[in-house]
Amino acid sequence: MLLENIGYDNKSSLLIVKRLITTMYQQNYLIISANDSKQNPFFGYNKNLHSKILSEGFAIIVEIPFYLRLISSLEGAEIVRFYNLRSIHSIFPFLEEKFPHLNYSADILIPYPAHLEILVQTLRYRVKDASYLHLLRFFLHEYSNCNSLIITNKSISIFSKSNPRFFLFLYNSYICEYESIFLFLRNQSSHLRLTSSGVLFERLCLYRKIEHFAEVFANDFPVIPCFLKDPFMHYVRYQGKSILASKDTPLLMNKWKSYLVNLWQCHFDVWSHAASIRINQLSKHSLDFLSYFSSVRRNPAVVRNQMLENSFPLNNAPNKLDTIVPIIPLIGSLAKAKFCNAVGHPISKLTRADLSDFEIINRFLHICRNLSHYYSGSSKKKNMYRIKYILRLSCVKTLARKHKSTARAFLKRVDSEFFQEFFTEEGGFISLIFPRASFALRRLYSGRVWYLDIIFINGLSNHE
């Protein structure tokens, strides 16, 4: 059968998946352990090809109900352009609006399950088909050594790279179960109900699961935390890192901290400790989130008030969210990619010296534009200028090495406008396209701009 479908190495087909599953049930290979898979004739030709086709098709099929539930929930909330919600930059306008009015934040690292069987146990609460769970266990045995008691981070990394779609489905199911319980308690313990909790479209019949939640509370939490009442509690997450912010006292944050640790340990059987959740005061510490350093600072301003014939100044100091480019981690990423050394001095890129001049310049410009696009929301542009300088000089040294010259001599031979694009701002393109653009429009683009077409962190920016 595999020889008949030899052209499906790089694609998934539901027909191929169906035929493979049928063959597996006919030949009864599901009962063979992972240790005997080398002698298994089912895997005799290409074991990875079978597993990849099956798991890809499996992930596609189980994603369909979640996608339909997403569409229905967004239509019910009258959200039309939900594609913009995919952008990670859409988180920052929310932070700008809410965080200046908050006092404390908790940096939360969501722990990975110690064993992949925990993911299966998490899904069994919402999946009633036993064959579904057996097939899921079969995939996990093929991708990892399930005889091991602990799954290391290296094993998880290999597992996620071998089949990212299948891994994301399992991980999102685990996160969904955790957040559904967490936000359910958050809504029950607050004076004000959260209207944004409808985004958790993955929940299956939440209010029909009250009995299950009651069982969780009775077994894991003898006292329901009804005292955790804070209408100014906000929660944001990206991948495995989340932030819990509040306007209340640190006592409430420490109570939520203990609750989360107990939730992971008692309900999900995931080892966690209090050190994984750090509580900081927003006015004194920066948040390392989405490759930005964000902090709340006072923005002093003098406002002149006019009452009848008298006028007098008023000192106003509202809080403002600062988003800063993390220069030291970013230089470390550039050094790892061989654009500079450890202290930020530009060096030539040896692997690109055999390309044409146009290709070398174009690749450096592509990296520079991507970084500028991602860090367009920075409130201070000075750090971004330094990154552009490193990339510009690295490009010059690469070209000079190719032409067997020095950087100074090479710059004298080329036009002064040769590298002008390295210093062109985002707003500079607006001035070139619209020469008569108003001063207000240019001022708008000289400030912070959040782009809703960015759905993942830039590779060089991802220093976490």
UniProtKB/Swiss-Prot annotation:
Keywords: Chloroplast, mRNA processing, Plastid, RNA-binding, tRNA processing. GO terms for cellular component: chloroplast. One of its GO terms (biological process) is mRNA processing. It is found in: Plastid, Chloroplast. GO terms for molecular function: RNA binding. The keyword Transmembrane helix does not apply. InterPro entries: Domain_X, Maturase_MatK, Maturase_MatK_N. Signal peptide: none annotated. Disulfide bonds: none annotated. Usually encoded in the trnK tRNA gene intron. Probably assists in splicing its own and other chloroplast group II introns. Belongs to the intron maturase 2 family. MatK subfamily. PANTHER family: MATURASE K. This is Maturase K. It comes from Castanea crenata. The gene is matK.
